Amino acid sequence: MANLTIVTEFILMGFSTNKNMCILHSILFLLIYLCALMGNVLIIMITTLDHHLHTPVYFFLKNLSFLDLCLISVTAPKSIANSLIHNNSISFLGCVSQVFLLLSSASAELLLLTVMSFDRYTAICHPLHYDVIMDRSTCVQRATVSWLYGGLIAVMHTAGTFSLSYCGSNMVHQFFCDIPQLLAISCSENLIREIALILINVVLDFCCFIVIIITYVHVFSTVKKIPSTEGQSKAYSICLPHLLVVLFLSTGFIAYLKPASESPSILDAVISVFYTMLPPTFNPIIYSLRNKAIKVALGMLIKGKLTKK
C-alpha cells in the first residue's frame, strides 16, 4: 500500500499575502457568506412553514438551499478565519473534509438542478399530467438520488486524491483545498487514475448541463405559444434564473479541465468563486426576487403569521 503522505498540513495561499488585501478579502467573503446564510435559511424556513409552498418546485428549492449552505460553509468560514488571523494552514484531515464536502455538495447540486429543470419542463409542457408525474414519492426519490450521487462522486475523488503522496511542497495555490491544485503539488508519478476520475466526472456533469439546456429549449418553445403575456413573463422569470445558476456552476468545468500549475494563478481563485460562492449567494435572490408566493410568505413570516399546517 502506497504511503499516503508525509505532509501533515497544507498552506492555503489564497488571493494575496498582503495585509490590506487579506482584510479586504475577509470583509468581502464575510458579507457574501452572511448574505448566503440569511437567504438560504429564510428559504428553508418559508418553504417548511408555509403549507401553500408544499409543492414539488419548493421542495426541490428547499433541498437546493440546504446544499447551498453546505457548499459555501465548506470554504468561506475557513478562508475568512485564515485571512483574519494571518494563518493559512489547514490540517491534512481538514483538507480531506473540504474536498469531500465540496464535491458532494457541488455534484449533488448540479444533479438536483437537472431534476428541477425536468420539473419545470413537466409543469409548463405537460401541465395536465404534472401531479401524476411529480407526485411526492417521486420528488423524494429524485432528491435522495441527487444527494447519494454527490456522496458517491465525493468518495471516489477524495479516496483517489488522498491515496497520492504529498512529500514536497505543501502550498496549495487556492483559498480552499481543491483537487486540481492538490494534484499539482503531488509527488506521485502515476496520476492517471485520478485524472480519469476527473474526466468521467466532467463528462457526467456535462451530460447534466446538456439535459438542462435541451429541457429549457422545449420549455421556451412552449412558452412562446402561451397567448398571455403575463403567463410568458411568469415562465421566463422561473426558468431564466435557473439557467443563470447552472452557468455559474458550469465554471467548475474550466477549473477542472484547466491544467493546474504549482505557480500561483489569481485566475484559478476567481473561477472558483463563481462555482463555490456565487450560486449559494444568488440562488435565494433570483428564486425569490420575482416570486410572488415567496414574497407573500416572507411578509407573513415577518409579521409572525406564518405557521405550518
Curated annotation (Swiss-Prot):
Positions of disulphide bridges: 95-187
First-listed, main subcellular location of the protein, grouped into a coarse class: membrane
Carbohydrate attachment residues: 3, 87
Membrane topology, as annotated: Multi-pass membrane protein
Residue ranges annotated as Extracellular topological domain: 1-23, 74-97, 153-194, 256-268
SUPFAM superfamilies (UniProt xref): Family A G protein-coupled receptor-like
Regions that span the bilayer: 24-44, 53-73, 98-118, 132-152, 195-215, 236-255, 269-289
Keywords: Cell membrane, Disulfide bond, G-protein coupled receptor, Glycoprotein, Membrane, Olfaction, Receptor, Sensory transduction, Transducer, Transmembrane, Transmembrane helix
Intracellular or extracellular location(s): Cell membrane
Ranges facing Cytoplasmic side: 45-52, 119-131, 216-235, 290-309
InterPro entries documented for this protein: GPCR_Rhodpsn, GPCR_Rhodpsn_7TM, Olfact_rcpt, Olfactory_GPCR
MF terms in GO: G protein-coupled receptor activity; odorant binding; olfactory receptor activity
Pfam family name, one: 7tm_4
GO cellular component labels: plasma membrane
Recorded family membership: Belongs to the G-protein coupled receptor 1 family.
Role according to the record: Odorant receptor.
Protein name (record): Olfactory receptor 14A16
Species the sequence originates in: Homo sapiens (Human)
Lineage: Eukaryota, Metazoa, Chordata, Craniata, Vertebrata
